[in-house]
């Protein structure tokens, strides 16, 4: 009989395995078949898959190794932001028209400011207090109420960040559709039906991220609700690899 604990552990491991598998396949494909002009796209995707795998490894550490998580939580916070930025840069590059300005690096700098601020704040919070916040699954530490709430709000912030960058990606795709008159004339780069599917899957990841606004972390981790974004991510990875 498949136990609940086994399903939870498998759910955490699934996006790690799928993202690492996709990264390896893209690297191998790049060395044997890819065109030189597609190099940037492949590098972005490999970076995205590696960030996703690292992010879910950090999530696994949060659940099973809380002491280690406290030491790497700044890294996890940065990965949460940057993975979505890299994904958007991939969409931006894929739909970039001749003469259009290159991707702005400000998208990477803004998360550094947020995470840097949190890192400085964390430096003034005792290690034991941070461990308590993690092991209690989101309980407010006495005397550190604001920090506790910010520390445990990452799923919610991740959902908001996802909404913002998925909306930007949709805007890019719609603008691209308006700018070209014949998709078939650019078939090498755009059979964009799959990009639409990719964005739909990405947008479907938003509601699970916002579950933390409804349920406590104790309930989320103890339930199977996290299987939803985990399985959707595996589907997203399959769509990308199949079409690249």
Across the structure, where does each feature detected by a protein language model lie?
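The cytoplasmic-loop to transmembrane-helix boundary for the fourth helix
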Residues: 95-128, 134-135, 146-155, 185-202
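Membrane-interface segments at the starts/ends of alpha-helical transmembrane spans
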Residues: 2-5, 68-72, 137-155, 219-225
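Membrane-embedded alpha-helical segments of multi-pass membrane proteins
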Residues: 15-21, 75-86, 157, 228-236
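Internal transmembrane alpha-helix with an interfacial aromatic "cap," most often the third helix
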Residues: 23-29, 81-106
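Hydrophobic alpha-helical transmembrane segments of multi-pass membrane proteins
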Residues: 15-25, 43-63, 83, 113-121, ...
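Alpha-helical transmembrane segments of multi-pass integral membrane proteins
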Residues: 35-54, 108, 148-212, 223-232
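Helix-loop junctions on the outward
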Residues: 35, 54-76, 208-222
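Hydrophobic transmembrane alpha-helical segments in integral membrane proteins
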Residues: 1-21, 155-159
